[in-house]
Structure formats: C-alpha cells, structure tokens
Regions:
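Short S/T/G/P-rich N-terminal loop/turn motif that feeds into the first structured element of a domain
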Residues: 1-34, 38-49, 61, 84
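A structural signal for short, well-ordered beta-strand segments
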Residues: 5-7, 53, 78
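An amphipathic, aromatic/His-enriched active-site/gating alpha helix that lines ligand/cofactor pockets
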Residues: 26-27, 56-84
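Short cationic amphipathic helices and targeting signals
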Residues: 50-56
Length: 84
C-alpha cells in the first residue's frame, strides 16, 4: 500500500540546527525496512518547513513503528494513496 506523509513545523520550532532531533529522521530511515516500510521518496522544502515522503507500507501500524518518534518534530499527516 502506498502512503504520502507530510511533516509540517514552523520556523520557531525548526530543528535544522539540532543534531539530536535531526537524528530521529535518520533513525526512521534506518529502521524502515525492519518494519516493512520502503521509502520511495524523501523530499524537503526547507523554506516552507515541510518534509514529504512517498512510502510503501503494509499498514498504518508499520508507519507508526517507523515514524512515531518523529511526531515530536511537528505534525505528520499520513495519507493512503494510489498511483494514477
């Protein structure tokens, strides 16, 4: 199943200078395969403080296991999608 994920945060809550917080994204990328999640695209619009992902995952629980800690870095919207 394909999913579109979007992380949104503000300039005031931006974590770009905080290596510990940035490491949460690295950890998510590392553990994704263990949770059955394949990251097809990880895209960033730095000036808008937005991260975009297209991932393949068997279910919502797999996404939570992969990206759950990243929810402390702003809002994450996880939407199931299909190819057009």
């Amino acid at each position: 199943m394909l999913w579109h994920l979007e992380n949104r945060h503000t300039g005031a809550t931006c974590f770009s200078k905080d290596e510990q917080k940035k490491a949460l994204w690295d950890k998510a990328m590392e553990i994704a395969p263990e949770n059955g999640v394949k990251v097809h695209h990880f895209l960033v619009n730095a000036s808008a403080h937005r991260f975009f992902f297209v991932v393949e995952a068997p279910d919502y629980e797999s996404l939570e296991a992969t990206f759950g800690e990243c929810k402390t870095l702003g809002e994450i919207e996880m939407t199931p999608v299909i190819s057009w």
